[in-house]
A protein has these predicted regions:
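A conserved short coil-to-beta-strand element within the FAD-binding core of flavoproteins
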Residues: 125-138
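A glycine-rich dinucleotide-binding beta-alpha-beta segment and adjacent secondary-structure elements
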Residues: 124-125, 298-379
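N-terminal Rossmann-like FAD-binding beta1-loop-alpha1 element of flavoenzymes
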Residues: 2-28, 397-402
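Glycine-rich FAD pyrophosphate-binding loop
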Residues: 20-44
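An anion/pyrophosphate-binding glycine-rich loop and adjacent beta-alpha core
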Residues: 33-35, 40-41, 49-56, 89, ...
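Glycine-rich active-site loop/strand segments that organize a redox cofactor
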Residues: 44-92
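Short hydrophobic core segments
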Residues: 4-6, 29, 129, 148-165, ...
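Glycine-rich loop(s) and the adjacent beta-strand/alpha-helix scaffold that form part
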Residues: 153-199
Length: 406
């Protein structure tokens, strides 16, 4: 049987290896000159290839439970065993994140490329597929150059439109659309959040530990804690990335509320700053937060709280301290949106999973067509979850309808 795979990213490479393992004749068509380019950029060049906590609650979309059969069939344990057989050693870090022992994403791509070559997979690079057609037997894919490819089974692994610089495109959505499939709304995900720049411009480049709450009115939509980084347009860092999906899909009227003292209550903070005022009354007022926060961040809080910069600590009133503490615990920023697909790591949304079988990833509309990875309406949390979905779904799709005992 001939298997044709369109897309040479993580899910496409896994699908190729999985299909070749069955003895199928596999052709992998990739739009770019080389396969796996996005892998080299994951995890800041380290490749966070999975997470030991990968399970359906860490995934999103219209039907997150869709991931369960694939994760049960080829989960974290089997993924790590698979990579070990290819010659890759790994190390588990905080929060269940797994990286190659070499600390280099190139190690992951290398072992995949070597395995693909060894198993006889034909790779057609620099080949942009623009059309797929159902034939009397199987499917035909036509490139922009006019070149044609055939497969008894067709697997679409084109990924999403995030990370355009690294090859993110919408081609997978268009190709599956030609076969009758529906695409949901698409949003940039795992990216920076844009806010009103009034108070963040002066903080550009500053890193801080904080709790971030995404809110609409009095309702908290999502809350995360950890390191953030201010930019001239808003907030970045792992915590902002974790909130970006909700910020992208949540519509208007959203705001971020930052807590820079998440280990302390406002009354405790107020008592601490009153004691500092009494101990050092002659110090400039702008030094009130100098032992607690980065200098520019502290001065921004003082300015927003209305504490006069030219005075002394002794002149700061109890009311000003109370206002400052409330602001330090509830620093509001109006959300203007998120950065676009160029900056995003993942696409939220994709092909409607109700039109695919969860156990095989075969199309319910076009028998013999399968889809895997980011092209489907599944996206995971930051921390290796999206790559695990790529491995799991690629493996299952590569079996081309063959169901193994779990």
């Amino acid at each position: 049987m001939k298997v044709l795979i369109i897309g040479g990213g993580a899910s496409g490479l896994m699908a190729a290896l999985s299909a070749a393992e069955e003895g199928y004749a596999v052709t992998l068509v990739e739009r770019q000159g080389r396969v796996g380019r996005k892998l080299l950029a994951t995890g800041n060049g380290r490749c966070n290839l999975t997470n030991t906590g990968a399970d359906s609650p860490r995934y999103h979309g219209a039907a997150p439970a869709f991931v369960r059969p694939a994760l049960a069939r080829f989960g974290v344990r089997r993924t790590l065993e698979f990579f070990r057989t290819l010659g890759l050693l790994t190390v588990e870090e905080a929060d269940g994140k797994v990286y190659p022992l070499s600390d280099q994403a190139s190690s992951v791509l290398d072992v995949l490329r070597f395995a693909v070559e060894q198993r006889g997979v034909r790779i057609a690079g620099s080949c942009d597929i623009v059309e797929v057609k159902k034939k009397a037997r199987g499917y035909e894919a036509i490139a922009a150059t006019g070149e044609k490819f055939f497969g008894d089974k067709l697997i679409i692994c084109c990924g999403g439109c995030a990370g355009k610089r690294l090859g993110g495109v919408k081609s997978g959505y268009f190709l599956l659309g030609q076969l009758g499939h529906r695409c949901t709304a698409l949003y940039p995900c795992l990216t920076q959040i844009k806010t009103d720049p009034t108070w963040v411009k002066a903080l550009k480049g500053i890193r801080a530990d904080a709790q971030l709450s995404l809110r609409r009115g009095g309702a908290v939509l999502q809350e995360e804690a950890g390191e953030i980084q201010f930019t001239d347009f808003g907030v970045s860092g792992p915590v902002a990335f974790a909130l970006s999906r909700a910020a992208a899909t949540g519509g208007e009227g959203l705001r971020l509320v930052l807590d820079f003292f998440r280990g302390y209550g406002a009354p405790e903070l107020a008592a601490f700053f009153r004691a500092r005022r009494e101990s050092f009354p002659a110090l400039p007022a702008e030094e009130l937060l100098s032992g607690s926060l980065q200098s520019r961040l502290g001065k921004t809080l003082l300015k927003r709280a209305g504490v006069a910069a030219g005075g002394t600590l002794g002149a700061v009133t109890d009311a000003e301290i109370e206002k400052l503490c409330n602001l330090a615990k509830h620093f509001p920023l109006e959300v203007l949106g998120v950065m676009g697909f160029d900056s995003a790591q993942v696409t939220a949304g994709g092909m409607d999973v109700s039109e695919f079988r969860a156990d095989t990833l075969e199309s319910c509309l076009a028998p013999g067509v399968f889809a895997a990875g980011e092209v489907l309406d599944i996206d995971g949390d930051c921390g290796g979850f999206n790559l695990q979905w790529a491995w799991s779904s690629g493996y299952v799709a590569g079996k081309a309808g063959k169901i193994e005992a779990i």
